[in-house]
Curated annotation (Swiss-Prot):
Function recorded in the entry: Multifunctional enzyme that converts the viral RNA genome into dsDNA in viral cytoplasmic capsids. This enzyme displays a DNA polymerase activity that can copy either DNA or RNA templates, and a ribonuclease H (RNase H) activity that cleaves the RNA strand of RNA-DNA heteroduplexes in a partially processive 3'- to 5'-endonucleasic mode. Neo-synthesized pregenomic RNA (pgRNA) are encapsidated together with the P protein, and reverse-transcribed inside the nucleocapsid.
Residues that hold Mg(2+) according to the record: 428, 550-551
Protein name: Protein P
Species: Hepatitis B virus genotype G (isolate IG29227/2000) (HBV-G)
PANTHER family associated with the record: POL PROTEIN (PTHR33064), RIBONUCLEASE H (PTHR33064:SF37)
Biased composition (Low complexity): 197-208
Membership in a protein family: Belongs to the hepadnaviridae P protein family.
Domain notes: Terminal protein domain (TP) is hepadnavirus-specific. Spacer domain is highly variable and separates the TP and RT domains. Polymerase/reverse-transcriptase domain (RT) and ribonuclease H domain (RH) are similar to retrovirus reverse transcriptase/RNase H. The polymerase/reverse transcriptase (RT) and ribonuclease H (RH) domains are structured in five subdomains: finger, palm, thumb, connection and RNase H. Within the palm subdomain, the 'primer grip' region is thought to be involved in the positioning of the primer terminus for accommodating the incoming nucleotide. The RH domain stabilizes the association of RT with primer-template.
Keyword tags: DNA replication, DNA-binding, DNA-directed DNA polymerase, Endonuclease, Host-virus interaction, Hydrolase, Inhibition of host innate immune response by virus, Inhibition of host RLR pathway by virus, Magnesium, Metal-binding, Multifunctional enzyme, Nuclease, Nucleotidyltransferase, RNA-directed DNA polymerase, Transferase, Viral immunoevasion
Renumbered residue ranges of the record's region Spacer: 178-345
InterPro entries given in the database record: DNA/RNA_pol_sf, DNApol_viral_C, DNApol_viral_N, HBV_DPOL, Rev_trsase/Diguanyl_cyclase, RT_dom, Viral_Replic_Matur_Polypro
GO molecular function list: DNA binding; DNA-directed DNA polymerase activity; metal ion binding; RNA-directed DNA polymerase activity; RNA-DNA hybrid ribonuclease activity
Length: 842
């Protein structure tokens, strides 16, 4: 007869009417009993002939992901002008006095952040925007381009101008200016800076970039004479020595590169193609129109170039016109020809935009290193989009980067730290990742972009195969005209207007701030916010500030104090250049919602939405049907989060873990499902540990156990010899049940770790419930008062040790120690409030 749920509960000693613990508990360590129970509950995985279930409720296997939904009305979020102050360490020191070594080290890590992958794989530009939404290809293309453009305008991306120069918007950092005024990085292999060597004494100063993108400052220093002179006469040798150093093997005019598989050089060729260039720029580029076709590979550089013979009049504009503007001069091929759209506007704006600042960068190919696509900002906000950047190449393969590890507070540390009678609020840091600047040397490794609209559309329509040499013909121009494209562009014209032209051009962008798709970013963000919170805790000694990634919480003893702290802390953070979103500040009262938990003075529980998810999961969980182990991973992930709040904890999930490890299907028996369901319907809070003196000690040998409870000594023997770890665990359980003490001394490291997953399954489940809420103190065997009783010697009494226990907050970054928080509120709270005490500047 199969094991019923009631029998199973009784077996696990979860019911009140169980026999004496010293007799019942060792039975659960018996391997034979564990095997019989496992077989009865189908936990011994049979060879299954029934097809596996690949979907349980919302949980699907990792390889059958949910289909993302495209929203044509997505709003691109706006990014404030985020600029973290470079002298952040000095500012903090002015505010709070000298920083600790740990705080300084962490802040230096992100000023600027550096990224050195082992090797970088470059992908063609066509892979820049992922065809994630096959039904909305064009719409997705423009939405993504607009998002990238917004990021560039906000100073979060660099725009590759040539292989060795980039432009950006926003305020420059000194390491970016260093690159501008002389020293530059010589190729990807060299990271050190090397000053320019003067090649000709007649040239007064060196500009790192071409004439069309000089800042006004440089133009005034160089004067227009130097631009028009040597450049207009086409003396390439001298113009080279003015603009950049050249390798003798690849001597060619500035800004022109050999075209690689038909990709555009993003800068000079398109600048020349702009119909809206200033006369100065035209003069500066006049010599290029004659030399451009002699670039080192046979065909022209510009993607969509037309041979001179086919342009209607060369006087109207430069020879190499752009794909979009060519439609203006061509005959419409049908009612849905793009020329109808292009002729709607006389002035489509420039073909390309340049940033406010220009810098020298290591050699950057016209390629991307990761693809991008858009998704909903989060499950609760589908109106705004979020950019997903896939730089997974750095986490895969033989050349993968092992990201630095950092301490994340575990549940007990978090409870010890935050479970108190404080009032809480949480701050929302807007676009937290984009606060941290990246060194320009990282740019060649973190490239995103797109190959331009025509190539993107052509690549996705299966009927037209692109051959690079076809680009020159007019007939080829109309190959991309279709009703679908025309209708999409007409609708998008309402949204983007003349920007359609700008976005239809190819572009390559590199990250100037850390992107979310790289494993280094969470580490850097965690270091940064933990250092800032450490500074805040010392600046405001009555405040408990704590952070995990971009989630920052403040706690104070009363609501009034919290409000005044909130004002002071926000002003301090704003003065460092950290952008907070005041609309998203949440005031939690006395129970804080943080990292998926609700933390109050009573302890910690999972948030309501997680318990709802668990209930829903059990409702949809099929019985007696094999479930794909990848779906089990998802189920275990959810149940594992709430496991510490259940009676039996993680050990109850061990059968699931075992099947995932063996990559086999798992079948839920009615009893096992009922057992788990009951476990998760009643959740118990995890309480904070209290400091205290240890009075109860346990010890065991394979054959017997011994306890020291105050001055009392006890001993007992096992029916059969047991493995030493199992014996020690049993002794700890007996100590807890006999004394009721929440603090037990033991010399066994496995018991100390409170991880009972490696014990026989039934024993692990029962022990977890008996020892729930118990704290352990390590006592060396030689000093353990329970050592003698465990060996059967009751006559000798070792003196009790004075073993103090201090709850740990783990390796969470509390470098500046917070003042201790009283466990109860006194009748009248007195604190040095900024409201009552006159404030003196630091």
């Amino acid at each position: 007869m199969p094991l019923s749920y009631q029998h199973f509960r009784r077996l696990l000693l979860l019911d009140e009417e169980a026999g004496p613990l010293e007799e019942e508990l060792p039975r659960l360590a018996d391997e034979d009993l564990n095997r019989r129970v496992a077989e009865d509950l189908h936990l011994q995985l049979p060879n299954v002939s029934i097809p596996w279930t690949h979907k349980v409720g919302n949980f699907t296997g990792l390889y059958s992901s949910t289909i993302p939904v495209f929203n044509p009305d997505w709003q691109t979020p706006s990014f404030p002008n985020i600029h973290l102050h470079q002298d952040i360490i000095t500012k903090c020191e002015q505010f709070v006095g000298p920083l600790t070594v740990n705080e300084k080290r962490r802040l230096k890590l992100v000023m600027p952040a550096r990224f050195f992958p082992n090797s970088t794989k470059y992908l063609p530009l066509d892979k820049g925007i992922k065809p994630y939404y096959p039904e909305n290809v064009v719409n997705h293309y423009f939405q993504t381009r607009h998002y990238l453009h917004t990021l560039w305008k906000a100073g979060i991306l660099y725009k590759r101008e040539t292989s060795r120069s980039a432009s950006f918007c926003g305020s420059p950092y000194t390491w970016e200016q260093d690159l501008q005024h002389g020293a530059f990085l010589d190729g990807p292999s060299r990271v050190g800076k090397e000053p320019f060597r003067q090649q000709s004494s007649r040239i007064p100063s060196r500009s790192p970039v071409g004439p069309s993108i000089q800042s006004k400052y440089q133009q005034s220093r160089l004067g227009l004479q130097s631009q028009k002179g040597p450049l207009a006469r086409g003396q390439q040798g001298r113009s080279w020595s003015l603009w950049t150093r050249v390798h003798p093997s690849t001597r060619r005019p500035f800004g022109v590169e050999p075209s690689v598989s038909g990709h555009t050089n993003n800068f000079a060729s398109r600048s020349a193609s702009c119909l809206h260039q200033s006369s100065v720029r035209e003069a500066a580029y006049s010599h290029l129109s004659t030399t451009k076709r002699q670039s080192s590979s046979g065909h022209a550089v510009e993607l969509y170039s037309i041979p001179p013979s086919s342009t209607k009049s060369q006087s109207q504009g430069p020879v190499f016109s752009c794909w979009w503007l060519q439609f203006r001069d061509s005959e419409p091929c049908s009612d849905y020809c793009l020329s109808h759209l292009v002729n709607l506007l006389q002035d489509w704006g420039p073909c390309t935009e340049h940033g406010e600042h220009h810098i020298r960068i290591p050699r950057t190919p016209a390629r991307v290193t990761g693809g991008v696509f858009l998704v909903d900002k989060n499950p609760h906000n589908t109106a705004e989009s979020r950019l997903v950047v896939d730089f997974s190449q750095f986490s895969r393969g033989s050349a993968r980067v092992s990201w630095p590890k950092f301490a994340v507070p575990n549940l007990q540390s978090l409870t010890n730290l935050l479970s108190s009678n404080l009032s809480w609020l949480s701050l929302d840091v807007s676009a937290a990742f984009y606060h941290i600047p990246l060194h320009p040397a990282a740019m060649p490794h973190l490239l995103v972009g797109s190959s331009g609209l025509s190539r993107y559309v052509a690549r996705l329509s299966s009927d037209s195969r692109i051959l690079d040499h076809q680009y020159g013909t007019l007939q080829n121009l109309h190959d991309s005209c279709s009703r679908q494209l025309y209708v999409s562009l007409m609708l998008l014209y309402k949204t983007f207007g003349r920007k359609l032209h700008l976005y239809s051009h190819p572009i390559i962008l590199g990250f100037r701030k850390i992107p979310m798709g790289v494993g280094l970013s969470p580490f850097l963000l965690a270091q940064f916010t933990s250092a800032i919170c450490s500074v805040v805790r010392r600046a405001f000694p009555h405040c408990l500030a704590f952070s995990y990634m971009d989630d920052v919480v403040l706690g104070a003893k009363s609501v009034q104090h919290l409000e005044s702290l909130y004002t002071a802390v926000t002003n301090f953070l704003l003065s460092l250049g950290i952008h907070l979103n005041p609309n998203k500040t949440k005031r939690w009262g006395y129970s804080l919602n943080f990292m998926g938990y609700v933390i109050g003075s009573w302890g910690t529980l999972p948030q309501e939405h997680i318990t709802q998810k668990i209930k829903q999961c059990f409702r949809k969980l099929p019985v007696n049907r094999p479930i794909d182990w990848k779906v089990c991973q998802r189920i275990t992930g959810l149940l594992g989060f709430a496991a510490p709040f259940t009676q039996c904890g993680y050990p109850a999930l061990m059968p699931l873990y075992a099947c995932i490890q063996a990559k086999q299907a798992f079948t839920f028996s009615p009893t096992y499902k009922a057992f788990l369901c009951k476990q998760y319907m009643n959740l118990y809070p995890v309480a904070r540990q209290r400091p205290g003196l240890c009075q109860v000690f346990a010890d065991a040998t394979p054959t017997g156990w011994g306890l020291a409870i105050g001055h009392q000594r006890m001993r007992g023997t096992f029916v059969a010899p047991l493995p030493i770890h199992t014996a020690e665990l049993l002794a700890a359980c007996f100590a807890r049940s006999r004394s009721g003490a929440k603090l037990i001394g033991t010399d066994n490291s496995v018991v100390l770790s409170r991880k009972y997953t490696s014990f026989p399954w039934l024993l692990g489940c029962a022990a977890n419930w008996i020892l729930r809420g118990t704290s352990f103190v390590y006592v060396p065997s030689a000093l353990n008062p329970a050592d003698d009783p465990s060996r059967g010697r009751l006559g000798l009494c070792r003196p009790l040790l004075r073993l103090p226990f201090l709850p740990t907050t783990g390796r969470t970054s509390l470098y500046a120690v917070s003042p201790s928080v009283p466990s109860h509120l006194p009748d009248r709270v007195h604190f040095a409030s900024p409201l009552h005490v006159t404030w003196k500047p630091p």
